[in-house]
Amino acid sequence: MGQKVHPNGIRLGIVKPWNSTWFANTKEFADNLDSDFKVRQFLTKELAKASVSRIVIERPAKSIRVTIHTARPGIVIGKKGEDVEKLRKVVADIAGVPAQINIAEVRKPELDAKLVADSITSQLERRVMFRRAMKRAVQNAMRLGAKGIKVEVSGRLGGAEIARTEWYREGRVPLHTLRADIDYNTSEAHTTYGVIGVKVWIFKGEILGGMAAVEQPEPAAQPKKQQRKGRK
């Protein structure tokens, strides 16, 4: 049988950034890795209803900086920033160093593989028909500008006795093209019949110029808006 390499792993350093960006010597590496895992585990559990896409961890000068990418920043921040302060204290205790938490808003959750997968799993847990949930996710992504999307669900679909896999695809999803910006993620729906696995691949277009183009995409767009205002 043909095997597939992880779409995110193969693109690291080419068009995908790492979720943990720090350097450590041999003695500290294991401790840093362990605290990274515990911080992510805590935040994922604590912010289960906040539509968290990814958690990026940096370690500048004996401190830890955590950036939470979420579609619902208001839920994470809380009233007058109280919730973020509580999270910061717990993260500092887990990591054992001063902590800073930044919030980054995900503008288009329909084009984020993790949020799409979580949306499908929540619908499956509410007993929505799996085909309807899949088609709705595909239509929303294509409507908002995705070049292609593939959604796969596997398990006891519809309560069937025998588990099976079904998938739905629209547009292009070129997994072998390394410069293709493909967002991939998974999620699990815990239903009365058992666990249903959900996988989502979203193709957003090709990135030319490698990591240099990925790390600074936004600043170039700002001067154009100012020029347009001047013309009016």
Swiss-Prot record:
Record bears the keyword RNA-binding: yes
Record's GO cellular component terms: cytosolic small ribosomal subunit
Q: Name one GO biological process term.
A: translation
Q: Which SUPFAM superfamilies match?
A: Prokaryotic type KH domain (KH-domain type II) (SSF54814), Ribosomal protein S3 C-terminal domain (SSF54821)
**UniProt keyword terms in alphabetical order:** Ribonucleoprotein, Ribosomal protein, RNA-binding, rRNA-binding
Q: Name one Pfam family in it.
A: KH_2
Gene3D superfamilies listed in its UniProt record: 3.30.300.20, Ribosomal protein S3, C-terminal domain (3.30.1140.32)
Instruction: Supply the InterPro entries for this chain.
Output: KH_dom, KH_dom-like_a/b, KH_dom_type_2, KH_sf_prok-type, Ribosomal_S3_C_sf, Ribosomal_uS3_bac-typ, Ribosomal_uS3_C, Ribosomal_uS3_CS
> What region holds the KH type-2 domain?
39-107
**Is this entry keyworded Ribosomal protein?**
yes
Task: List, in alphabetical order, the Gene Ontology terms for molecular function in this entry.
Answer: mRNA binding; rRNA binding; structural constituent of ribosome
In the record, the note on similarity to other proteins reads:
Belongs to the universal ribosomal protein uS3 family.
Function, as annotated: Binds the lower part of the 30S subunit head. Binds mRNA in the 70S ribosome, positioning it for translation.
UniProt subunit comment: Part of the 30S ribosomal subunit. Forms a tight complex with proteins S10 and S14.
Recorded hits in NCBIfam families, A to Z, give: rpsC_bact
Protein name per UniProt: Small ribosomal subunit protein uS3
Provide the species name: Erwinia tasmaniensis (strain DSM 17950 / CFBP 7177 / CIP 109463 / NCPPB 4357 / Et1/99)
> Which gene produces this protein?
rpsC
